[in-house]
Amino acid sequence: MTTLKIKTDKVEKPLNKEALIADKQTVKTPKEKMDNSGRFYATGKRKNAIARVWLKPGKGQVIVNKKSLDQYFASETQVKTILQPFTLTKTNNQYDIVCTVRGGGISGQKGAILHGISKALAQSAPDFHAVLRKGGFLTRDSRVVERKKYGQHKARKKTQFSKR
């Protein structure tokens, strides 16, 4: 029986307790994406919709595709769900928001704006990150429409089966 000897170029260093403690204490914080005019930028996605969100300190004005939030979304419940991150972090009427949304329908665009606002809020104040994560606003909803398969009526619906 032959034995193989493996040569390694790496020299193992003795473990340093201080280095290990320093590694454990480093916590991931979201990167600041602030532009020159003091706005926080984030992108949100939901289904086929992509929202680009700019957040800056202000009076609580929300503009979506050059329209006010009430003009863009007809339903009051949609407006309330978009503003949920502010009620959760208790920052109502403290930030101005400008969004551009493309693709998808109204529901997907609403979810994309909500996701983008949450990410921008988490960048503006690091202590909001844990609150928004716990509320489920920072996780991207990855559910998308399943594609239609050939030989079938829809994605899952098949033609009626006849035994005889």
From Swiss-Prot:
- InterPro entries according to UniProt: Ribosomal_Su5_D2-typ_SF (IPR020568), Ribosomal_uS9 (IPR000754), Ribosomal_uS9_bac/plastid (IPR023035), Ribosomal_uS9_CS (IPR020574), Ribsml_uS5_D2-typ_fold_subgr (IPR014721)
| One annotated GO biological process | translation
UniProt keyword terms in alphabetical order: Ribonucleoprotein, Ribosomal protein
Recorded GO terms, molecular function?
RNA binding; structural constituent of ribosome
GO cellular component terms? cytosolic small ribosomal subunit
Matching entries from SUPFAM superfamilies are given as:
Ribosomal protein S5 domain 2-like (SSF54211)
Highest taxon of the lineage? Bacteria
PANTHER family for the chain: RIBOSOMAL PROTEIN S9, SMALL RIBOSOMAL SUBUNIT PROTEIN US9M
Q: Which family does the entry's similarity section mention?
A: Belongs to the universal ribosomal protein uS9 family.
**What's the protein here called?**
Small ribosomal subunit protein uS9
**What species is this protein from?**
Rickettsia bellii (strain OSU 85-389)
